Amino acid sequence: MAVSTQQLAEELQIFGLDYEDSLLEKLAELCVLYRQTEDGMVSELIAFCTSAGKTCLTVDILNSFEYEVLNKKLSKAWHSASKDSGHAGTRDIVSIQELIEAEEEEETLLSSYTTPSKGPLKRVSSTPETPLTKRSVAARSPRQLLSPSSFSPSATPSQKYTSRTNRGEVVTTFGSAQGLSWSGRGGSGSVSLKVVGDPEPLTGSYKAMFQQLMGVREVLTSKIEELGSELKEHHKIEAFTPLLVPAQEPVILLGQIGCDSNGKLNSKSVILEGDQEHSYGAQIPVDLSELKEYSLFPGQVVIMEGFNTTGRRLTATKLYEGVPLPFYQPTEEEGASEQTMVVVACGPYTTSDSITYDPLLDLIAIINRDQPDVCILFGPFLDAKHEQVENCKLTSPFEDVFKQCLRTVIEGTRSSGSHLVFVPSLRDVHHEPVYPQPPFTFSELSREDKKRVQFVSEPCSLSINGVMFGLTSTDLLFHIGAEEIFSSSGTSDRFSRVLKHILTQRSYYPLYPPHEDMAIDYENFYTYAQLPVTPDVFIVPSELRYFVKDIFGCVCVNPGRLTKGQVGGTFGRLYLRRQPKAMDGGGRQGLSVAAQVVRI
């Protein structure tokens, strides 16, 4: 169907609507995509602008017009065609995909009967309302593949989400973000992605649910001894004293913070559990009344100095500071790229009152517009806590819904060329709910997509062009913050305290006992959930308020979640600049990071 940009311009001039010349091509594409004539498209556009009180056509207005008018009109036509053809008004996601594949097979069969001089034959639609036309559009449009009827007969778009007025608002900024275009090079730039492990990263499933208490005890003891050895060397401590040995002079003890009961830790219930080498795993109560400042949580490995005159109670007078790991040193090839744009977003990708994936589709549109070099997507993609999932109201198996969601993201961003990194979550209802969590598996990737799509474990350390990213979808801020106790003479930021704990404890999840939502396999935890280095950028999504902070030279980002209940949430974007010849005070290659958290 040929569309004339000149005729579109004439129609717009008739109604006196101002516009940018660059928008005519976009308007022509919409005419082809939604099978509209020039005058019909302009008439609907004028009606939309008039009702919205707009006198000038902009990119944002055109995007809103496509979303609020054209897509809804197309969805209604799809339902009407489904009813007229004698089928149920809703199709699940499997049946839609089968129809698309069947159509492609028929077109392939028709083309096999043509001569090379002729073009491939296409089936002709008798009217624009036939289901075939809608399937053709659905094959190209991510919004149609993830239409409300794909998952649940009762699915309707969230009214609060669609009526939001603050989309695109920048809510927090870090670094020199002023003047940046916030657009990447997509597939045109060279991107090096490498998963880093100590000794190796988690790449597949493992046998869980079989660990003995002695095995857990050995892991925790090893953590105490290894971290204690590092702190001993750093603080130049001669020797540790056993916990239960009485002494009249000050003693220095190594151990792990615990609680003397099953309740929440408080200043009166703190105990110190010693290591095997010095204290044989003994425990001793701790009196914190002499400490002016402290921040403690269960599972924290600490070195304390104080008095233990009876061998039954330690009166702590000093708490030694923890020390983070050194930074990652990239190779010459990894550090060759000078600038990289990264987008990070965390699920859920649906609002709590609807199973429609409108927020995810809006994110796909942003990826195609900005063309970031890398886009990191954290689960959950199909949230186990969603009401319709809990009540089993979906018409398709969880695995099928997830695969279609994944397929839509991959195909929908193909034109941008952006590299995609998928991080699972323990809230992904279809995936293995064990920590550390193995990567997703998806066998339907094409050869081209395999070059730009990567599935990683939870948690994961990922080098992007020599910049080390720490990635985790677990809400560390909430889990540790809920168990922490602290005392400070001045103002203190809880987020900064928790982040310092994570970096100095050198673990992606240092809390013990873990949160009730966590099913931890400690044998694999010891292998795959430790920080191999201090990351340059640490992504820590949380239900708590978004932020960007510099902790020990590590840029820590909480991008928030893409949805918050029934309303839209936030996502993050980072702009990284390498300065190969510059070195910072920590002996690492110069790195400049600008970051923003933006409303979807």
Curated annotation (Swiss-Prot):
GO CC terms, sorted: alpha DNA polymerase:primase complex; ciliary basal body; cytosol; nucleoplasm; nucleus
GO molecular function: DNA binding
InterPro entries per UniProt: DNA_pol_a/d/e_bsu, DNA_pol_alpha_B_N_sf, DNA_pol_alpha_bsu, DPOA2_OB, Pol_alpha_B_N
Purpose of the protein: Accessory subunit of the DNA polymerase alpha complex (also known as the alpha DNA polymerase-primase complex) which plays an essential role in the initiation of DNA synthesis. During the S phase of the cell cycle, the DNA polymerase alpha complex (composed of a catalytic subunit POLA1, an accessory subunit POLA2 and two primase subunits, the catalytic subunit PRIM1 and the regulatory subunit PRIM2) is recruited to DNA at the replicative forks via direct interactions with MCM10 and WDHD1.
Region (Disordered): 107-165
Family as reported in the entry's similarity comment: Belongs to the DNA polymerase alpha subunit B family.
Subunit structure: Component of the alpha DNA polymerase complex (also known as the alpha DNA polymerase-primase complex) consisting of four subunits: the catalytic subunit POLA1, the regulatory subunit POLA2, and the primase complex subunits PRIM1 and PRIM2 respectively. Within the complex, POLA1 directly interacts with PRIM2.
Keyword annotations: DNA replication, Nucleus, Phosphoprotein
Predominant subcellular localization, coarse grouping: nucleus
PTM annotation (Phosphothreonine): residues: 127, 130
Subcellular location(s) per record: Nucleus
GO-annotated biological processes: DNA replication; DNA replication initiation; DNA replication, synthesis of primer; protein import into nucleus
Name of the encoding gene: Pola2
Low complexity: bias regions: 139-159
Secretion signal span: none
Keyword Nucleus recorded: yes
Protein name: DNA polymerase alpha subunit B
Modified residues (Phosphoserine): 126, 141, 147, 152, 154
Tagged with keyword Phosphoprotein: yes
Changes after translation: Phosphorylated in a cell cycle-dependent manner, in G2/M phase.
